[in-house]
Structure formats: structure tokens, C-alpha cells
């Protein structure tokens, strides 16, 4: 048997590729980061084979580039992701997310009494690292949650 080195997800001419997303996290990223709020073509690969992760997800968005803030906010969900900026089918920049100090507009506060759940305000969380565990503190109710609690609420 010969190994076939074909791309499993079609290459894009210009745009962003988010690679090395943990398996089953790709759809959540599309929703949370509002990546589908575009008329550009989006290609998603789910449960693709990965030497590092075993399985991974992949997102390709044509003619769209993530801001540095968006790239860094990915670190909460996909700390080992790589974000590639593509032009003329070539990688022109390769970025790794860095944990930001703050995450805005992406997450929902788990506190059902928080004003951010009922008022037209953008959510905002301070990111804290405590003993190798991430905690997120809501700007409005000032409650602090383990990051997995906020993620499950997303």
C-alpha cells in the first residue's frame, strides 16, 4: 500500500487557517467567535488525523483574517492551535495564541443573576491563572469561575 499525501481539506488562496484545534472543539469556535457571520466560504475538517493530538479539527476561512485579539482568545479553547495567514496559497504568517488578560464578547457568564445575561452588554471576563488552572472573572457580577464551568455554559 502506498501512502496518499493528498490534502484532506481543500487549500485556500487567501484567508485564515486555524489548525491543531482539539477534536470536537471546531464547531464551538465557529459559534463562539461568530466566524460564520460572513458570506465567505468556510471549510471545516473534523476529527482529522493528527500526529500531535491523535485527532484534530481544522477551520479555513477565505478572504478573512483574524485580529490578534481573536487569535489570542483562541488560547482558552485551543492553546496549541496555530493560526496561519494565507496569501496566494502560501503561508505568509504563522501565529500561536497567547492567553489574553481579558476575553470580550465570546463567553456567557454562568451566573444566572448576572446583568450580562439580561442587559444588552457584551460579556467580559478577566483571565486568571491559578495553580496551572484557568479561572475567568466576570466584569459585571465579579464572580470567578473555573474556565471549564464557563466553557460548558457557552
Swiss-Prot record:
Cofactor note (record): Binds 1 zinc ion per subunit.
Alphabetical UniProt keywords: Metal-binding, Pyrimidine biosynthesis, Zinc
A GO BP entry: 'de novo' pyrimidine nucleobase biosynthetic process
UniProt binding sites for Zn(2+): 109, 114, 138, 141
GO cellular component, one term: aspartate carbamoyltransferase complex
Pfam family, one: PyrI
Stored InterPro entries: Asp_carbamoyltransf_reg_N (IPR020545), Asp_carbamoylTrfase_reg (IPR002801), Asp_carbamoyltrfase_reg_C (IPR020542), Asp_carbatrfase_reg_C_sf (IPR036792), Asp_carbatrfase_reg_N_sf (IPR036793)
One Gene Ontology MF term: metal ion binding
Keyword Metal-binding among record annotations: yes
Cystine residue pairs: none
Listed cofactors: Zn(2+)
Role noted for this protein: Involved in allosteric regulation of aspartate carbamoyltransferase.
Family (UniProt): Belongs to the PyrI family.
Subunit structure, interactors included: Contains catalytic and regulatory chains.
Protein name: Aspartate carbamoyltransferase regulatory chain
Lineage of producing organism: Bacteria, Pseudomonadati, Pseudomonadota, Gammaproteobacteria, Enterobacterales
Name of the gene this protein is made from: pyrI
Amino acid at each position: 500500500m502506498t501512502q496518499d499525501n493528498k490534502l484532506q481539506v481543500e487549500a485556500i488562496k487567501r484567508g485564515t487557517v486555524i489548525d491543531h484545534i482539539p477534536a470536537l472543539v471546531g464547531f464551538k469556535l465557529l459559534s463562539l467567535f461568530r466566524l460564520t457571520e460572513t458570506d465567505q466560504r468556510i471549510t471545516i475538517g473534523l476529527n482529522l488525523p493528527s500526529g500531535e493530538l491523535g485527532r484534530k479539527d481544522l477551520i479555513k476561512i477565505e478572504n478573512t483574517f483574524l485580529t490578534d485579539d481573536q487569535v489570542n482568545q483562541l488560547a482558552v479553547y485551543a492553546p496549541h492551535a496555530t493560526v496561519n495567514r494565507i496569501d496566494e496559497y502560501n503561508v505568509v504568517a504563522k501565529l500561536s495564541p497567547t492567553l489574553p488578560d481579558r476575553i470580550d464578547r465570546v463567553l456567557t457568564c454562568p451566573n444566572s443573576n448576572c446583568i450580562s445575561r439580561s442587559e444588552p452588554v457584551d460579556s467580559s471576563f478577566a483571565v486568571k491563572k491559578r495553580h496551572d488552572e484557568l479561572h475567568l472573572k466576570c466584569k459585571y457580577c465579579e464572580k470567578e469561575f473555573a474556565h471549564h464551568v464557563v466553557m460548558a455554559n457557552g
